[in-house]
Each structure stands twice: as structure tokens, then as C-alpha cells.
Amino acid sequence: MNPTLIILPTVNERENLPRMAQKLLSLPAGVDVLVVDGNSSDGTGEIADELAAKHPEIHVLHEQKKNGLGRAYIAGFKWALERGYEFIFEMDCDFSHNPDDIPMFLEAAKNQDADLVLGSRYSGGVRVVNWPLKRLMLSRGAEIYVRIITGMPFSDPTGGYKCFRRRALQAINLDAILSQGYSIQIEMTHRLWRQGFKVIEVPIIFTERTEGHSKMSGHIFRESLIMVWRLWLQNGLRRRPHIK
């Protein structure tokens, strides 16, 4: 077993999953892959099973219904902790997140003894490819909104390319996570930051998918806007502890 696990939530990613799996398995660092399939209707789950049968590094969890990104990651985190992985990644399956950046995340986590490494689209400038101006403005506005309400100092608190250390995930009550969907990106980062864990950022380039369809929707956007207030109310005026 490799010490690093990549969690790939999938819903209808048949075009991307085989290519992503091949790319991840070719990385020199050596990683295991967990596909958490949300009851895909296009055969993605079956493709994942076929890949797992050929490659011992690939594993699959099947959800009986589309429970949302948040529930998929919680299932993946629990699976990873039960099996002793040291570094656990969140990552999109559609190549929006470049697999070649994984060694950079690992190096940053080890060299800086970080508990959570965030891939930032906005560290030192804007690093987004093939987004229309409207979407870029909405994204930047959301980042500012989250930072103001939560107090988090990070340039990209809503990003979805992350590397957690085992000790950080162990410190969170995963059953108490509120998020069902994309707002888990905000909630997990906020909980670790509030608990005093060391969170750092590394710059990444985010490239809009070329295969399949985006899962972003108005409901997802609204959930994230509401989540920051739930986190604020939950924490009140409690002071954040010093970094561990």
C-alpha cells in the first residue's frame, strides 16, 4: 500500500476516469486511488470496477444514490483513515486539477510540516484557464465573501484540490460535518484552521474541463453562501488557537 491516497468522486465521468487513472498510476511518487461513484448513469461505476480489477492500486466505493460531493468525500476520508493512509487528496476527475501537481503538494506538506495543503487558483494572481469573465468574477467574489465572513486568510478557501495529513482528518468528527455538497471545501478548511492546524497554500493552474459536463449549479452556489454563516454562528466569538 502506498502512503498517499487520491480520492476521486465521480458522477458520469466515463470519458475522464480511464485517462485520469492511467495518469495517476504513472506518477513517480506512487499513489493509490479511491473512486467514489455517485450512482453514475453512464457506466462510470462499471469502468471503475474494471480498472480496479486490473490495478491493485485502484479501489471503488459505490453510492446507491447521488448523495453530493460532501458525502462522497466523507465516505472517502473514513475509508482512508481505516486503512492507514498518511496523505489524503481531494481532487477532481475531469483534469481541472493537474495530476502532475501532486508531488508539489507532497513536498510542501513534508517540508513545511503542514496539516492541510490548499491548491490556490489565486495565489499571486489569477491562474484559471478557459473560464468566461462572468464565472471568474463570481468565483473571485465568492472567495472574498468567504474570507470576510469566516476570517480565513487564504486566497482560495473554496478550492477543491487539497492534501490532508492523516492527523488532521483524525482530529475532525466527520459525522458532524454539515455539508452535503461543494461547501465541504469551505467547511473542512475552516474546521482545521479554527482548530489551530497548519494550513498552507501552493499555486496551481485550474483548467476548465474539456470532457463531460460541469456539476456546478445554482443550488450548489447557494449552499456555499449559506454555509459560511452557519460556520460563523457555530464558532461565534471563540478565539482560534495557536498553530499546533
Question: What does each model-found stretch correspond to?
Answer:
Residues 1, 151, 175-244:
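Hydrophobic helical membrane-anchoring modules
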Residues 3-5, 32, 187:
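Cell-envelope/extracellular polymer assembly enzymes that use nucleotide-activated donors
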Residues 8, 21, 30-40, 61-62, ...:
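Short beta-strand/loop segment that forms part of the nucleotide-sugar
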Residues 12-26:
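Short, well-formed alpha-helical segments that are part of the catalytic scaffolds
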Residues 13-16, 40, 98:
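Donor nucleotide-sugar binding loop of glycosyltransferases
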Residues 24, 76, 94, 165, ...:
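Residue-level signature of catalytic and energy-coupling elements of molecular machines
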Residues 37-47, 95:
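A conserved acidic beta->alpha catalytic loop
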Residues 61-82, 87, 99-182, 209-224:
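Acceptor/aglycone-binding surface of glycosyltransferases and processive sugar-polymer synthases
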